[in-house]
Amino acid sequence: MCGIIGIIGREDLSERLFQGLRRLEYRGYDSAGMCTIHDGKLDRRRAEGKLDNLGRVLANDPLPGKIGIAHTRWATHGAPTVANAHPHIAGDVAVVHNGIIENFKTLRDELLERGHHFESETDTEVVAHLLDEQMQAGKDPRHAVSKVLKKLRGAFALAILFKNYPDLLIGARLGSPLVVGYGDGENYLGSDALALAPLTQKISYLEEGDWVVLTREGIEVHDIEDRIVERPVVLSGASGLMVEKGNYRHFMQKEIFEQPVVVAQTLQSYLRPVEGQVALPDPDFDLSQIKRVTIVACGTSYYAGMVARYWIERFARVPVEIEAASEYRYREPVMEEGGLSLFISQSGETADTLAALRHARAGGQKIAVVVNVPTSSMAREADLLLPTHAGPEIGVASTKAFTCQLAVLAALATHIARVKGQLTQQEEQDIVRHLAEAPAALNAALAFNDTIENVATAIAPARDVLYIGRGPDYPLAMEGALKLKEISYIHAEGYAAGEMKHGPIALIDDKVPIIVLAPSGPLFEKTVSNMQEMQARGGKVILISDEKGIQEAGDNCLATLTMPKVHPLIAPIVYAIPVQLLAYHVAVIKGTDVDQPRNLAKSVTVE
């Protein structure tokens, strides 16, 4: 959600700023812009829409300069127009900003009363005016930034240029991530390590409330109390190759097909197949004393949490609640002693989830996190860090991060069950064996790609689509519906199969495809009964099951998709493949922007 890159160096850097924005495209955006200091003035270029539009602006009107900031904007305040695109300039100050300034209206009204005039509808322009006001009052950039930061409420990451200080680039963060990079005679700011990947591998993650002064010679970090502090310098490991599609048409397609490998990599960190054991990192607390688990997440991660609830309650016999992160803090949840709060996030920076984590921490809960970015804010604040190893996920619609989350959550459920004495050694060995089978089963599921592509032609014309499942397949139904909504823009809903007769069955007619997730097993017969109720009312069913299930129930279906026969434990991991591929192929047929669907952002860093 929005992206920032800033460079201070000794050579013209317009092209490097632009390529940095390319690496930030995956975060989602609807406009973009850049600003440098050149010949004693702030020089800016902006464009609405895709980066190619900004590229054309730069081709017609190049942007020289040896210090600059650049930004991709995902609209929060004001429409996605050129006037609202960043950077924003007020007098001698240029600013780019990720996040939301919650008290911007109050600040704006005060500035208007003092005679300021605004060119945009954004909250960001308020920051530029406040800083310029301080500069006009005789403050230097450091004092101006320190004073203005204390007036801002909300979540933000900022990069700031001062026209009369071409040897100074300032950044700040509170509730939104910002990384600094160390170069040779130049230094960098970025929203994440990927933005800086080809420029440097030496980075520092700023902490909450930090602000930083970059010169060509060095970097000076200040904490929230304005004290100069040191932040650890680490090697990022990020590579520009991570944001290339290779031979695939879309990043989403590439990431779907990477799942056998990345799930295997993830499981390798948590399974000891020879011993038949799950091995988790040692937490800072005793997991055997946990009395309740509260899972908190958003979007696809929330559905991974729903699956985990089945596993934890079944194996560990510990009660589990699951909460939407955006709602968690606002219902005054009861936090009992002995509670574990489990937070799931691909980026580890999701604003709602991070705020919920801090709320749970304040309530005395132990904190575990499942994240794909082990250097993220959530990772740094956890008592138990459980990283996935999916690698960077560029497509906005999550695919490989989801299946890796499921792999980690299955391992966690097994570990809790063992330390609480709920599993025999043989039962744990069986679970480990079945989890180890998941990568091969994912490969087998991907082999049906062509068949799934053909079935997608029956879904693409639909206005509405329903997904149903039972047990752990119910969250998969909801995830499948979300995927279709996200990238094809078709209205879709996921339901527990048994709930259809309690209202949603009224939607059934011959124009509404119904995707049924029903691997053969204990819940198969009941799911098929629900499916047949819909067929009796003209519903056009696409049944996803294994060979046995298709033989038993596939005769009257519009189409069937045969998945490999797998143990029920790993069915949610394997059955993610067909719902992801269905959504992908429908979106391709409809010609939508698969990797950057409208109105969506990869990392939602505002509440």
Swiss-Prot record:
Protein name per Swiss-Prot or TrEMBL: Glutamine--fructose-6-phosphate aminotransferase [isomerizing]
First and last residue of the signal peptide: none
Span of domain Glutamine amidotransferase type-2: 2-217
Taxonomic lineage from the root: Bacteria, Pseudomonadati, Pseudomonadota, Alphaproteobacteria, Sphingomonadales
InterPro entries: GATase_2_dom (IPR017932), GFAT (IPR005855), GFAT_N (IPR047084), GlmS/AgaS_SIS (IPR035466), GlmS/FrlB_SIS (IPR035490), Ntn_hydrolases_N (IPR029055), SIS_dom (IPR001347), SIS_dom_sf (IPR046348)
Keyword Repeat attributed: yes
Annotated GO MF terms: carbohydrate derivative binding; glutamine-fructose-6-phosphate transaminase (isomerizing) activity
Reported function: Catalyzes the first step in hexosamine metabolism, converting fructose-6P into glucosamine-6P using glutamine as a nitrogen source.
